[in-house]
Amino acid sequence: MPRIAALPDHLVNQIAAGEVVERPANALKEIVENSIDAGATAIDVELDGGGIRLIRVSDNGSGIHPDDIELALHRHATSKIKTLNDLEHVASMGFRGEGLASIASVSRLTLTSRQEDSSHATQVKAEDGKLSSPTAAAHPVGTTIEAAELFFNTPARRKFLKSENTEYAHCATMIERLALAHPHIAFSLKRDGKQVFKLPAQSLHERIAAIVGDDFQTASLEIDSGSGALRLYGAIAKPTFAKGKTDKQYCFVNHRFVRDKVMLHAVKQAYRDVLHNALTPAFVLFLDLPPEAVDVNVHPTKTEIRFRDSRQVHQLVFHTLNKALADTRADLTESVSNAGEVLHDITGVTPAPMPSENDSENLFNRASDYPTGNKPDTRNAFGSSGKTAPMPYQSAYAPQQRSLSLRESRAAMNTYAELYKKTDDIDLELSQFEQARFGNMPSETPAPKTDTPLSDGIPSQSELPPLGFAIAQLLGIYILAQAEDSLLLIDMHAAAERVNYEKMKRQRQENGRLQSQRLLIPITFAASHEECAALADYAETLAGFGLELSDMGGNTLAVRAVPTMLGKADVVSLARDVLGELAQVGSSQTIEEHENHILATMSCHGSVRAGRQLTLPEMNALLRDMENTPRSNQCNHGRPTWVKLTLKELDALFLRGQ
C-alpha cells in the first residue's frame, strides 16, 4: 500500500475547483459576487466563447490593497470573516476565500485593482496556479478580473463542457439572477463584443420587469409580509400565467439565489388549489432574515441552504402566497401587503372582505349586497364601508337588461337555489330573496319608453360592480356581461364550481374535525396484517378524520362511519389508502387530499351545467358571488373562469379607428 503523503497546493486547488467551478457560469458567479461584496454600484461583464475563452468582470468597488493582491489568489484568504462567530453571522456573498484560488488554478487569470487612495493600480497574473510578481498598471478605482481559457490545463474537465451557446445561456442566467437580487447595482453584459443588455440602477419593480419580462409584471401580484424577524416580499404570477417550465422561478434568501426545498414546497402548496394539471407557477420571492437564522455553508456553490426554523419559513411563505391567491377575485387588485391586506380596488370603491369562516349565509341569499332600502348598516357588494354601489335593478339600465319576468323565472330560480341549499342545508326563502333583491323591479311591465340615448342609461364606473351586469347567455355555456368599457365572458359552470368548492371548504374549516355519518350497513373488507396493525395503533387518528373502523377478526375490517362529505366515495379504497399511509409514516394527509378531491368533484357535479338556460337574475347573482369568493378567477382545476375584452380590443376586431 502506498504511503500517505500531503497533496501539493496546486492539486488541492484543482480538486476544490471541481466543486466550486463546474462550468463558466460558476466562475462568473464567484467573480461577480466579489464585486458585490466590494460595494460596487456598476458591474460590467464580457464573455467570449460562452465564457470558455474569456470572462472579464469590471467593477467600481472599493478595490484591493496592493499588499493584499497576491494573497487574494491564495486558498482560504479572505477579508470577510476571522472567527467562527463571523461565519455564523456572515452577510456577504462570499466568505470561504476559495473562489479566486480555484479559478486561478484552472485558467489564465489576470487581476487588476486600485483603491481610491492609490496613485496607480496593481496587477497580478496566475497561470496553472503559478503567480507572477505584482506590477503597476493603469486602471480606474475598482477591480477587473479576466479568466481566460477555462480548464485549459484540465482537458478531461473541458470535455464535459457543452457548446458555447449552452454555456453562454448558463452565464446569462447567472447574471440575470444576480442583477435581480441587487437592483441597486447597474449591470451590463457583452457577448463576443456585442452588447446584450445594459441595466441601470433600478427599483425592484423595474428590475423584475427588465429581467423576468413585462408579461410577468402585468400578470403578477405584489406581496410584502413579515413574521418576527422574517420578511417576505416580491411578486407572484397569477395562476393563468403558469407555464410548463420552471425558468421563471426565483427564490432569494438574503439576496442570494437559492434552490430551497422548504420554500418551493410552500409555494407548491399555495398554488395547489388553482393550478391546472402539470403547470408550474412563476414567482420572484425575496426572504430577508437574520444571517444567523440560515446556514449558507452547506454546499460549495451556496445554492443550498438550511434554515434554523424551517417551519416558520414554510408557514410564512405558504400563508402569504395562499392569502394573496385567495384574494384574486374580481373586486380586488393585484397588490397585497402584510399577507393579503388589500391596498385599493380597481373601481376606487372599498372592496368586499373575504367571506367569514363563520358565515353560513346562503351564497344566493345576499339581500344586503344590493339593498332595496336605505339601511345604514347594510353592506354593499364592494365592502362594508366607502361608496355605496346602487341597486342594479333600480338603475335606468335595469329595464334594458331584463329578458324574463320574475314570475317566468321563478322555476329556474328554484332550481339554481336548490344547488346551494344542498351544500348549505339552509332553507332558502325564495319569496324573501326576491323581495330583497328584486322588490322594486317591475315584474310584467314592459320597459318604459324614453328619449334618453341608450348610453345614458348605462351606469357610470362608480355604479358598476367589478364583473358588471349580465346581458345575455351564449350557447348555454357562457355569460356575457357588460362592465366599464369592456365585455366579460364568464364560464358559468367553472365559476359556479369555484363558488361551491370554496363554500364547502369553508364549512370544513369551521368544524376543525370532519363530521362523520354512520353507515346503515357496515362495509367489510379483507385487510392485510399491516392494515390491521395500523387500525390498532391509530384508531383515534382515524376517528378524528371521520373514519370509524372495527376489527372483525380474521383479518377482516368493517367500516362503520365515514366523513359526511365523502359519503359517496369508495369507502374501502379510502380506508385502505389511509391505513396504508399510517402503516408507513404514522400520520396521514390522505384524508385531507382525498377530501379536497371529493369536494372538487362534488362542486363540479353540483354546479350549473353547460346547456342550462339561466335568467338574468340568476346570472347576476352568480357574478356577485364570484366577486365575494376567493380564487374565483380560476375553477378548481386551474382554468380561468372569465376573460375580458376591452373596448379597444373590440374596436380592433372591427378595424375601427384604423
UniProtKB/Swiss-Prot annotation:
Pfam families: DNA_mis_repair, HATPase_c_3, MutL_C
InterPro entries, sorted: DNA_mismatch_repair_CS (IPR014762), DNA_mismatch_repair_MutL (IPR020667), DNA_mismatch_S5_2-like (IPR013507), HATPase_C_sf (IPR036890), MutL/Mlh/PMS (IPR002099), MutL/Mlh/Pms-like (IPR038973), MutL_C (IPR014790), MutL_C_dimsub (IPR042120)
Molecular function GO terms recorded: ATP binding; ATP hydrolysis activity; ATP-dependent DNA damage sensor activity; mismatched DNA binding
The keyword Transmembrane is assigned to this record: no
Keywords, comma-separated and alphabetical: DNA damage, DNA repair
Biological process, per Gene Ontology: mismatch repair
Domain of life: Bacteria
Location of region: Disordered: 114-137, 369-401, 438-457
Database matches in SUPFAM superfamilies: ATPase domain of HSP90 chaperone/DNA topoisomerase II/histidine kinase, DNA mismatch repair protein MutL, Ribosomal protein S5 domain 2-like
Compositionally biased tracts (Basic and acidic residues): 114-130
SMART domains: DNA_mis_repair (SM01340), MutL_C (SM00853)
UniProt keyword annotation of DNA damage present: yes
CDD domains per record: HATPase_MutL-MLH-PMS-like, MutL_Trans_MutL
GO cellular component terms attached to this protein's record: mismatch repair complex
Cited NCBIfam families: mutl, PRK00095.1-2
Function recorded in the entry: This protein is involved in the repair of mismatches in DNA. It is required for dam-dependent methyl-directed DNA mismatch repair. May act as a 'molecular matchmaker', a protein that promotes the formation of a stable complex between two or more DNA-binding proteins in an ATP-dependent manner without itself being part of a final effector complex.
HAMAP family assigned to the protein according to its UniProt record, in alphabetical order: DNA_mis_repair
Family per record: Belongs to the DNA mismatch repair MutL/HexB family.
Name the record gives this protein: DNA mismatch repair protein MutL
Organism: Neisseria meningitidis serogroup A / serotype 4A (strain DSM 15465 / Z2491)
